[in-house]
Structure formats: structure tokens, C-alpha cells
Amino acid sequence: MPELPEVETVRRGLAPAMEGARVRKLHLGRPDLRFPFPADFAGLIEGKTIISLGRRAKYLLIELEDGLTIVSHLGMSGSFRIEAEKGEGGEAPGAFHYARSKDGKHDHVVFHLDKGEERVCVIYNDPRRFGFMHLVERNKLDLYPAFAELGPEPTGNALSADYLASRFEGKSQPLKSTLLDQKIIAGLGNIYVCEALWRAHLSPLRAAGTLVTTRGKPKAQLIDLTEKIRDVIADAIAAGGSSLRDHIQTDGTLGYFQHSFSVYDQEGQPCRTPGCGGTVERVVQAGRSTFYCAACQK
């Protein structure tokens, strides 16, 4: 499932084609994805101009001029691609035009857009149909069930060591499962938690509360972890995300941060920490694979 860097990569790729474009037609290939489309979904969107593309955690936000926002989740296999309208010459805005790379029978949503002199299609493809699109009033986004209790973004100023100390204090739960709690940090997933903990030399099995002093202040290790979380997310976004299973960027290319994985999916490989000499291990926590080096992550 795409994590925050993958969704941010998609947002950045779609923005040149979608922002400022008018939705001439919205084609739905079926009545539902994971959930049914909202009633009169196409009718509520056609004729509207897209004013901006945003993101909250792992959700893409397509904001329309009339105060409605399309909340889109990619699910397990969803992806967007951008193509010039059939019969039109030239490339789509942002130079993201490319030949079809996915089976057309899984093209479930097609935005036919007018942007200046250009006509472009933005196509949502989802073989497993685990993604979804909802319509939400922009001024009620904070009340949307998936957003109501989300923690701060790992890329924003709200994420600080002091904040994490306030959430970790007294917690006996393992550090990894605590970081995966979307109520604490929004958008962090399995891959990037494993990588951040390795960079901070912290065991995913360690109790989260041990990183907080008896006075409720962050220990030096928690200050460092906060920085490492920011760093790993920034590095992944710069690399275009990680192309595991079905994720592709909007220009059809694959992200390449997976080539920089230090521990994730590296079971049995030598630890990359200089001078460590340990081996990456895999354990299962709450039904999910955790990768770490027991020799240097304490």
C-alpha cells in the first residue's frame, strides 16, 4: 500500500496537468471501487475547475472550485497516469504523456480535462479495486472520519520531539507499533518506520516510553529519532517513493528509494551501519514484518 512519499510523488506528478484544469467529462467504468461512488459523482464534478491538489497523510485531495474536495485513496494497487486526449497531438501538461502501461480494463475513472489549449486525460487504474474516491465539503474536511483523529504530518513543523514525548510518555507498547499509530503521526507506514528506526539506532521492540525522561521531556534519542523520521521521508519523496508491488509514478516510471533500503526487506543481509557487523533480522509485530539489526539497534 502506498505510503506518504508515494502519495506525495503522485500529487506532484498530477499537479501540472490537473491544477487549473476544467473537468469537461468524468467517465466511471463501474459504479464502485472499494466503496460505491457518491450519488451523481460525475454530475457534481463535470464543468468544475480544479483549483489545487493537496495531500493529507496517505490521501490525495483534489479541490474543486465550488467548495467540494475529492478525497482519493490508492488502496493496494491504485495508480494515476496522464495522457493526451486521443486524437490530440503534443504532450500533456507537465510532459507526463506516455503510452498506456496498464491493462485498460482496470481504468475505472477517467478525468477528461481542458487546460488552456490542451485536452488531457487523467486515468485512475486499480486492478484490485481497493482504492476509493469520496466527495467532501472543503470546510468539513477535518470532520471526515479518516482525518478526524490524524496526528501531525511528519513533514510539518508540528512534529517535534516535545510532541512525541507527550505521546510516548508512559507507553509500554513497542516503539514501532507506536509510530505506526496514525493518531500520533499521520502517513507513516511500515517501510519508513523501519528505515527511520535503523537510522536512529533504536530497536523497534523497545518500549516507546523509555525515550522520555521522568519529567516528560524527550531524551536525546527521541530528538534524534524525530530528525531521522523527517530525513527518511524527505529522502523518499526526493527519490520518487518506493515502487513495491503496484506503485508507479504518474509519468509511468518507478520510484527508486527501494534501492536505498537499509533494513526493509533486507533479511539476512549485513547491516549497513559502519563497523556494526550485525545482520538484518525479520520479526513479526502485530501481523506485520519488522526488519532491524539487533546488534546496533537498542
UniProtKB/Swiss-Prot annotation:
Cofactor: Zn(2+)
Pfam families according to UniProt: Fapy_DNA_glyco, H2TH, zf-FPG_IleRS
Reactions that this protein is recorded to catalyse: Hydrolysis of DNA containing ring-opened 7-methylguanine residues, releasing 2,6-diamino-4-hydroxy-5-(N-methyl)formamidopyrimidine; 2'-deoxyribonucleotide-(2'-deoxyribose 5'-phosphate)-2'-deoxyribonucleotide-DNA = a 3'-end 2'-deoxyribonucleotide-(2,3-dehydro-2,3-deoxyribose 5'-phosphate)-DNA + a 5'-end 5'-phospho-2'-deoxyribonucleoside-DNA + H(+)
Signal peptide: none
Location of the active site: 2 (schiff-base intermediate with dna), 3 (proton donor), 58 (proton donor), 288 (proton donor)
Entry's cofactor comment: Binds 1 zinc ion per subunit.
Keyword terms: DNA damage, DNA repair, DNA-binding, Glycosidase, Hydrolase, Lyase, Metal-binding, Multifunctional enzyme, Zinc, Zinc-finger
GO-annotated biological processes: base-excision repair
Binding site for DNA: 106, 128, 171
EC number, as in UniProt: 3.2.2.23, 4.2.99.18
ZnF FPG-type: positions: 262-298
GO molecular function, one term: 8-oxo-7,8-dihydroguanine DNA N-glycosylase activity
Description of how the protein assembles with itself and partners: Monomer.
Task of the protein: Involved in base excision repair of DNA damaged by oxidation or by mutagenic agents. Acts as a DNA glycosylase that recognizes and removes damaged bases. Has a preference for oxidized purines, such as 7,8-dihydro-8-oxoguanine (8-oxoG). Has AP (apurinic/apyrimidinic) lyase activity and introduces nicks in the DNA strand. Cleaves the DNA backbone by beta-delta elimination to generate a single-strand break at the site of the removed base with both 3'- and 5'-phosphates.
Family statement: Belongs to the FPG family.
Record protein name field: Formamidopyrimidine-DNA glycosylase
Organism: Agrobacterium fabrum (strain C58 / ATCC 33970)
Name of encoding gene: mutM
